[in-house]
Amino acid sequence: PVVPAAHYQCGGIVVDLDGKSSINNLYAAGECSCTGLHGGNRLASNSLLEALVYSHRAAADVIKRVGAIEFNTNVPEWDSEGTVQPNELVLITSNLRELQNVMSNYVGIVRSDQRLKRAMDRLRIIYGETEGLYERTIVSPRLCELRNLITVAYLIVKSAQARKESVGLHYSTDYPPVEKLIS
């Protein structure tokens, strides 16, 4: 069946005009960054130009500063003592599907306080189960990706819960669009 799908995110890592974040030596450009150029919505073709401009500006800034950056090469080897091979990969797959369903059903195009609360409740359960897997199994890319997706989902829901108006693509049935508040 044809269903809505998230193919980009509005928001992300807040950066300055050179793509610098608030974390020293961390730059962001493209879909992961929040430049402020889009306002309350994202125009379809603008993201490509934004990515090109900000990646160019970030690269130019890094080139100027690269000689002064200190790199820590003393990183300890991974210690997997006390962990086991994951015998239950189906748990990772199941949690990923559940996460996708929660975000699609409750944090999609139309939102409400009730849906967001339900999403947060489910996210806490998925988080707890996933952290249990992380603590006792050898780390895998799939498990790390799931943990990252849960973190992003949590941040999206938390931010949506803090918003008390409907602006651009941030629409809630509980709050009128800003245009109606102004008129």
PLM ranges: what are they?
Residues 2-5:
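Short Gly/Pro-enriched turn/cap motifs at secondary-structure boundaries
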Residues 8-10, 14-28, 32-183:
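Glycine- and aromatic-enriched mobile tails/lids
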